[in-house]
Amino acid sequence: MKKILVTGGTGFIGSHTVVSLLKSGHQVVILDNLCNSSINILPRLKTITGQEIPFYQGDIRDREILRRIFAENRIDSVIHFAGLKAVGESVAEPMKYYDNNVSGSLVLAEEMARAGVFSIVFSSSATVYGDPGKVPYTEDMPPGDTTSPYGASKSMVERILTDIQKADPRWSMILLRYFNPIGAHESGLIGEQPNGIPNNLLPYICQVAAGKLPQLAVFGDDYPTPDGTGMRDYIHVMDLAEGHVAAMQAKSNVAGTHLLNLGSGRASSVLEIIRAFEAASGLTIPYEVKPRRAGDLACFYADPSYTKAQIGWQTQRDLTQMMEDSWRWVSNNPNGYDD
């Protein structure tokens, strides 16, 4: 059993990882500034896990709160989700993204070292591959030209953590590049609640299903894919959460930099996702085809074989379960955590 600090632990992926950590017998401390999440998730986490979870409201750029957390808790490892994640916003406000995501991660690493904590699991992204020109994506592909400051910030933090580990071999740096997390906890108590108009496909579909948006925008139907719409590697958020726990358990005591894809190895198109959600919900999702968005790729998906060999993890939940769990979340909580 380990005590894990989860930064961004009230966010979408962070909260599901907290559930998975506690289910695996670990202790958890959460740090979150609530800029993209709700305090109302905490009682729901208690309902699911039966445990009161220590919570600190604060920012990873705040050295004082980090020092207090490390002084008050014997932390063994950090799982680091905290950061901003809207691609479009990052293009409009790059300084905000580099400050939060890059500077914040550097402050966190410095304070971890000061406290003698040398194990971190970093929430990275498949966006760091850019457009390598072939699929599936494998871990030995070099980082590419990212199309947004968001993607660039993830790539920069990967480089920073890798360089820190080279200089100080006590560190275990676990860099998890994940693909497209969707779904929700099977209880229907926690799920994704984006602020404003969603940037990602499934939350957008859920908003249409809940009557909050009139129709879905499908960006491009002329890609070189079977139905002309973009294809992505979708992964159930609980599979993703379990991947974090498996990586932490397998590698946190192994010095080095460990780079792993977390994906299913299968690609689904936008129209396939719409049809799967309609089947799960019994609803019809109206949509309108619009021009392609700049920077969007036709198709990408993970090669998960290296990750399976390294940490014994692979996805367990199929597209049907992703849709059923998403629909349960949105139908039980049409206003998210404000209900």
UniProtKB/Swiss-Prot annotation:
<keyword id="KW-0520">NAD</keyword>
<feature type="active site" description="Proton acceptor">
    <location>
        <position position="150"/>
    </location>
</feature>
<dbReference type="GO" id="GO:0005996">
    <property type="term" value="P:monosaccharide metabolic process"/>
</dbReference>
<feature type="binding site">
    <location>
        <position position="180"/>
    </location>
    <ligand>
        <name>substrate</name>
    </ligand>
</feature>
<dbReference type="Pfam" id="PF01370">
    <property type="entry name" value="Epimerase"/>
</dbReference>
<dbReference type="InterPro" id="IPR001509">
    <property type="entry name" value="Epimerase_deHydtase"/>
</dbReference>
<protein>
    <recommendedName>
        <fullName>UDP-glucose 4-epimerase</fullName>
        <ecNumber>5.1.3.2</ecNumber>
    </recommendedName>
</protein>
<comment type="subunit">
    <text>Homodimer.</text>
</comment>
<dbReference type="InterPro" id="IPR036291">
    <property type="entry name" value="NAD(P)-bd_dom_sf"/>
</dbReference>
<keyword id="KW-0119">Carbohydrate metabolism</keyword>
<feature type="binding site">
    <location>
        <begin position="32"/>
        <end position="37"/>
    </location>
    <ligand>
        <name>NAD(+)</name>
    </ligand>
</feature>
<comment type="similarity">
    <text>Belongs to the NAD(P)-dependent epimerase/dehydratase family.</text>
</comment>
<feature type="binding site">
    <location>
        <begin position="12"/>
        <end position="13"/>
    </location>
    <ligand>
        <name>NAD(+)</name>
    </ligand>
</feature>
<keyword id="KW-0299">Galactose metabolism</keyword>
<feature type="binding site">
    <location>
        <position position="150"/>
    </location>
    <ligand>
        <name>NAD(+)</name>
    </ligand>
</feature>
<feature type="binding site">
    <location>
        <begin position="81"/>
        <end position="85"/>
    </location>
    <ligand>
        <name>NAD(+)</name>
    </ligand>
</feature>
<feature type="binding site">
    <location>
        <position position="100"/>
    </location>
    <ligand>
        <name>NAD(+)</name>
    </ligand>
</feature>
<feature type="binding site">
    <location>
        <position position="125"/>
    </location>
    <ligand>
        <name>substrate</name>
    </ligand>
</feature>
<dbReference type="InterPro" id="IPR005886">
    <property type="entry name" value="UDP_G4E"/>
</dbReference>
<feature type="binding site">
    <location>
        <begin position="59"/>
        <end position="60"/>
    </location>
    <ligand>
        <name>NAD(+)</name>
    </ligand>
</feature>
<keyword id="KW-0413">Isomerase</keyword>
<feature type="binding site">
    <location>
        <position position="179"/>
    </location>
    <ligand>
        <name>NAD(+)</name>
    </ligand>
</feature>
<dbReference type="GO" id="GO:0006012">
    <property type="term" value="P:galactose metabolic process"/>
</dbReference>
<feature type="binding site">
    <location>
        <position position="150"/>
    </location>
    <ligand>
        <name>substrate</name>
    </ligand>
</feature>
<feature type="binding site">
    <location>
        <begin position="200"/>
        <end position="201"/>
    </location>
    <ligand>
        <name>substrate</name>
    </ligand>
</feature>
<dbReference type="GO" id="GO:0005829">
    <property type="term" value="C:cytosol"/>
</dbReference>
<comment type="pathway">
    <text>Carbohydrate metabolism; galactose metabolism.</text>
</comment>
<feature type="binding site">
    <location>
        <position position="232"/>
    </location>
    <ligand>
        <name>substrate</name>
    </ligand>
</feature>
<feature type="binding site">
    <location>
        <position position="154"/>
    </location>
    <ligand>
        <name>NAD(+)</name>
    </ligand>
</feature>
<comment type="function">
    <text>Involved in the metabolism of galactose. Plays an essential role in the incorporation of galactose into meningococcal lipopolysaccharide surface molecules, which are important for pathogenesis. Catalyzes the conversion of UDP-galactose (UDP-Gal) to UDP-glucose (UDP-Glc) through a mechanism involving the transient reduction of NAD.</text>
</comment>
<feature type="binding site">
    <location>
        <position position="125"/>
    </location>
    <ligand>
        <name>NAD(+)</name>
    </ligand>
</feature>
<feature type="binding site">
    <location>
        <begin position="217"/>
        <end position="219"/>
    </location>
    <ligand>
        <name>substrate</name>
    </ligand>
</feature>
<dbReference type="GO" id="GO:0003978">
    <property type="term" value="F:UDP-glucose 4-epimerase activity"/>
</dbReference>
<feature type="binding site">
    <location>
        <begin position="293"/>
        <end position="296"/>
    </location>
    <ligand>
        <name>substrate</name>
    </ligand>
</feature>
